[in-house]
Amino acid sequence: MEITWLGHGTFQFRLPSGQVLVMDPWIDGNPAYPKGCKIDRVDTICISHGHFDHIHDAVPLAKQFDPEVVAIFETAHWLESKGVAKTRPMNKGGSQKVGEVMVTMTHAVHSCGIVDEGKIIYGGEAAGYVLHLPDKRVIYFSGDTNVFSDMALIEQLYHPELAFLPIGDLYTMSPHEAALACRLLRARKVIPMHFGTFPPLTGRPDDLRERIRGLETEVWALEPGKPVQW
């Protein structure tokens, strides 16, 4: 599978079959979005919560590519009101197959208000995702969150081999909390996200790497716009 970090909390996953998933799309106005990078296909969008830096380009991409859009029930309803045709609403603990990927929605510790024309709309709750790939490998995409003890249940239930965790601090957990998340999840690799986009997001991969020294988890720091194979 090809993974491309598109800056901040946005990722593109391209499966061997060709299915393309975009996680938490924020392109327009994203200072970390790689210059010259173009999205040419989207089959699936997964949205962890309704904040602008995770949902901003969901509607434009949906109208351009007509993908299936996975989100918690209330956020999916809001997207429908904006003209998104193919929503796949769900809630925590539920699973559904989207293309070739079985998607399970998990808990997250964060807020989820959607700013719409100057008002904050209730968007349900923030969530994470477990992605069960066709080759039986498992990804955990936490979305924005703090560490929570039930990450141990995510490990127990799903055994993710690759985890995507925010480390920026201020609006999410910092490397200090993310290090505990690594210990609870026991994934082989962790890809840090949601850091460095703005000056207050001070967490850095090297700090996380130092804090989990001795743990059998590799901190895999990606470069925006540069695809990697996993």
Swiss-Prot record:
Alphabetical list of SUPFAM superfamilies matching this protein: Metallo-hydrolase/oxidoreductase
Keyword Transmembrane helix: no
Keywords recorded for this protein, A-Z: Hydrolase
Coiled coil: none
InterPro entries in the record: Metallo-B-lactamas, RibonucZ/Hydroxyglut_hydro, UPF0173, UPF0173_UPF0282_UlaG_hydrolase
A GO molecular-function annotation: hydrolase activity
HAMAP family named among the record's database cross-references: UPF0173
PANTHER family: UPF0173 METAL-DEPENDENT HYDROLASE MJ1163, UPF0173 METAL-DEPENDENT HYDROLASE MJ1163-RELATED
UniProt family annotation: Belongs to the UPF0173 family.
Protein's name according to its UniProt entry: UPF0173 metal-dependent hydrolase Acid_3917
Species for this entry: Solibacter usitatus (strain Ellin6076)
